[in-house]
């Protein structure tokens, strides 16, 4: 450190200034004060002769520390990933504490035991409640029968998208329908029905009293009831002559009985277009209805041999070489057949396209 000594020159007075004794005393007093201050500063410098060198050394050290910090930042960026890998490795396995994933083998075993007993207790409670629930529910009769919709319908033979397309002169186009009908009607063979079921009087419900777990008897529905659509008189079910047979059945509903003792009937017509496209339909049985003797249905557990009644539609005179949309509906009291969102409740729509 370099010190600048103040000038010892006497103070200058302005031009024309008249010298007075008081002014001289004041100037002398200021001069002596400056001299004392300079003497004190020189004494401090003499007492600490290496102060300037120490200050320079401190400044040099600060510069070196700044350079080292800059170099350390560059090196820390390269070694950061290595430190992270070391931390992960110690977390996976710490050989000093013999811990893996921050847990010892003993603590893991204890946790497994706790979870085992917890889930075992939970499973036991759930099983107990399910068992009690099944004790309160009858397997033979549905609990909420009022939520069941009116019966839906299905047809046989099975047809993709409910479109019956075939050529009378090409058996390979309609043979699959014949095979489907023959397979479906095997359970309706007369000999099998006479062996398993009983002959019930028509026109009234077949109500069977007794315990709900008691086996129920079923009424016969013979294949011969379908006459020209039974496959007994015409093995091709009319497909070889362009007069196809289609079978319709209602879905089974436990406890269902047609209201007011009137049987449910079937009616088919052109769904959209010229009504004369279908000029003649024969129904089998001739009443075109599901007889009351097949109701009520008691469920598959007790009504083992129950056979669903059928109604066959024999389309004897249908316009050829064009698609004819057909709608078959169930009709009776309590039957719903106009649900827009479900075309299988009380009705079904299919297409006939018979080529010659």
Curated annotation (Swiss-Prot):
This is Protein ATP1B4. Expressed in skeletal muscle (at protein level). Expressed during postnatal development in skeletal muscle and heart. Disulfide bonds: none annotated. The keyword Isomerase does not apply. It is found in: Nucleus inner membrane. Residues 1-109 are nuclear. Residues 33-43, 51-72 have a biased composition (Acidic residues). Keywords: Membrane, Nucleus, Signal-anchor, Transcription, Transcription regulation, Transmembrane, Transmembrane helix.
